Regions:
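Transmembrane helix-boundary elements of multi-pass transport/secretion proteins
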Residues: 1-23, 121-122, 163, 173-174
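Secretory targeting signals
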Residues: 1-13, 37-105, 110, 140-159
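Helix-loop-helix units of permease transmembrane domains in multi-pass membrane transporters
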Residues: 13-45
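Membrane-interface elements of multi-pass transporters and channels
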Residues: 17, 61-69, 99-103, 119, ...
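Hydrophobic positions within alpha-helical membrane elements
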Residues: 22, 35, 106-107, 166
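Residue-level signal for alpha-helical context at structural boundaries
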Residues: 28, 32, 54-55, 114
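Terminal transmembrane helical anchor/hairpin motif
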Residues: 111-177
């Protein structure tokens, strides 16, 4: 739920500036496009990281106070997997923000990639390689799987995140504003 709110909140981080013309002012003063893209991306990732871990900490302490957290194992790796999934989704948002000039295009592009990932996860041969596997941490929490079982999905997610970040930067450098 929180990730959906973050995507909706950050979906217009570039597109609103395209429409208002505020990026033109910054770029005509000589500020490099690469730095604008990098700073906006880093702020989005930092915001996700801080909000996620604060939320995790509050939930963890709340559950510890009222219930026993001893039944759950591998809680930090499970949280880190969901955090990494959020990083991937945010980098998709940034990529589509560099590609499209409308917030609806950004949200549609990000949603389409997520839906394709969910649909592809139906096929057993590829499901271990997809970023959506990182959302299946319930099995990890109940010790039905090991942390190492998520290694392929983590590697693919990191590579796809890096590709989205680099491609977004290249698109933003060439985009007419």
């Amino acid at each position: 739920m929180a990730l959906i709110v973050v995507v909706l909140f950050l979906g217009g981080m570039f597109t609103q500036e395209y429409q208002r013309g505020t990026l033109v002012l910054v770029l005509t003063k000589g500020f490099p496009r690469r730095k604008v893209y990098t700073v906006k991306t880093m702020i989005a990732l930092l915001m996700w990281t801080i909000c996620f871990w604060i939320s995790f900490g509050i939930t963890w302490f709340y559950n510890s106070y009222y219930w026993d957290n001893g039944i759950v194992s591998h809680i930090l790796p499970a949280a880190a997997l969901f955090w990494l999934f959020g990083i991937w989704v945010l980098l998709l948002v940034v990529f589509f923000s560099a590609l499209f000039s409308e917030t609806s295009g950004v949200l549609a592009g990000t949603g389409a990639i997520l839906v394709l990932s969910y649909v592809a996860a139906i096929f057993p041969k590829v499901q271990d390689f997809l970023p959506v596997k990182l959302l299946g941490v319930q099995e990890l929490l109940l010790e039905s799987t090991a942390v190492g079982d998520y290694g392929q999905a983590v590697l693919v997610t990191v590579l796809m995140s890096a590709a989205a970040a680099i491609a977004g930067m290249l698109l933003f450098e060439k985009k007419r504003i």
